[in-house]
Amino acid sequence: MTYDILKELYWLFVIEYATLNSQATFNAEKDSNGYAQGGLGAGVTNMSDWSGFNGYYPFVPCGHTDELGNGTGEVAYPVINEDGSTRCTVMVPRYRGVENPFGHVWQWTDGINIRISPTEENGGDGLSKEFVCTDPAKFSDSGYDGYAHVGNEARAEGYVKEVIFGEGGEIMPSVVGGGSSTYFCDYH
């Protein structure tokens, strides 16, 4: 998935669910006005021993939620140990036909590069500059030709409080200091 598509998908979710917290508990029921409520659920991110199970590698087969078609919902997935016993069961989210759109695994995303400069003491400007590109012919993992600088990403880790946003609705964090249930609710 390209960054541009991921960004559009995220903002569609935010508008439809009226929340920045995509991992809020899933609720299939509409509110009294007919609007979506809740979020897509924690998905597989709440598995307590994911690292011990397989070192954080993906383990949900692609297409597990296909029964939902282009809909939105969750489908249970039993995580099976080598001996055949069930380790736990996770809920796999699907949003408008896209399986695990947010928060499943670290993902490679074309159309965005971050240039991380050394700190000022080390001869740089100390910034992490976000560059984006919407032309697949110009996608690059290391270059910036055809990319536009859209803002500076937060250098510190923490929960996202503000995103770059700008003219393109960028979703990369510019400020941390939020929480797991406040602001954007995602850890950077």
What are these regions (language model features)?
Residues 1-152:
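Functional-site microenvironments in short loops/helix caps that host divalent-cation chemistry
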Residues 133-187:
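Acidic, glycine-rich loop-and-strand cores that form catalytic or ligand-binding grooves
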